[in-house]
Amino acid sequence: MEQTLSIIKPDSVSKAHIGEILSIFEQSGLRIAAMKMMHLSQTEAEGFYFVHRERPFFQELVDFMVSGPVVVLVLEGANAVSRNRELMGATNPAEAASGTIRAKFGESIGVNAVHGSDTLENAAVEIAYFFSKIEVVNASKPLV
């Protein structure tokens, strides 16, 4: 089973969309293997988005991500990375397919409801950034 990282961004948290977004993930067959609510510091946001540090939108992205609490999740399931990206929709909510998270809850390219890992390799790095191994459960393991 694959795992991927998802972040419910400050705009979705402040508008009380957490439950709806979690339901979308679970109804699609993805399981929640870890979850925490936190308010990112400037340093944490800069570290997480370090790969974008040379891009013109970097500071605006960091400022947005520290503007309020976020919910950080590890999602687990078959093809978790690609499934999560399909559920999220295009980065620009105006271009996102109807019914996707960003089409429903996003406002703009910068204020677009959720983040999701783009590759399995990046998912592993991003998960390790926010969670220790002991915090991530095997969500696909059947209960005894």
Swiss-Prot record:
GO terms for biological process: CTP biosynthetic process; GTP biosynthetic process; UTP biosynthetic process. It is found in: Cytoplasm. It comes from the Bacteria. Its EC number is 2.7.4.6. One of its GO terms (cellular component) is cytoplasm. Gene3D superfamilies: Nucleoside diphosphate kinase-like domain. Its cofactor is Mg(2+). Keywords: ATP-binding, Cytoplasm, Kinase, Magnesium, Metal-binding, Nucleotide metabolism, Nucleotide-binding, Phosphoprotein, Transferase. InterPro entries: NDK-like_dom (IPR034907), NDK-like_dom_sf (IPR036850), Nucleoside_diP_kinase (IPR001564). It is an enzyme of class 2 (transferase). It catalyses: a 2'-deoxyribonucleoside 5'-diphosphate + ATP = a 2'-deoxyribonucleoside 5'-triphosphate + ADP; a ribonucleoside 5'-diphosphate + ATP = a ribonucleoside 5'-triphosphate + ADP. SUPFAM superfamilies: Nucleoside diphosphate kinase, NDK. The active site is at residue 115. GO terms for molecular function: ATP binding; metal ion binding; nucleoside diphosphate kinase activity. ATP binds at residues 9, 57, 85, 91, 102, 112. Pfam families: NDK. The keyword Kinase applies. HAMAP family: NDP_kinase (MF_00451). PANTHER family: NUCLEOSIDE DIPHOSPHATE KINASE (PTHR11349). Major role in the synthesis of nucleoside triphosphates other than ATP. The ATP gamma phosphate is transferred to the NDP beta phosphate via a ping-pong mechanism, using a phosphorylated active-site intermediate. Belongs to the NDK family. This is Nucleoside diphosphate kinase.
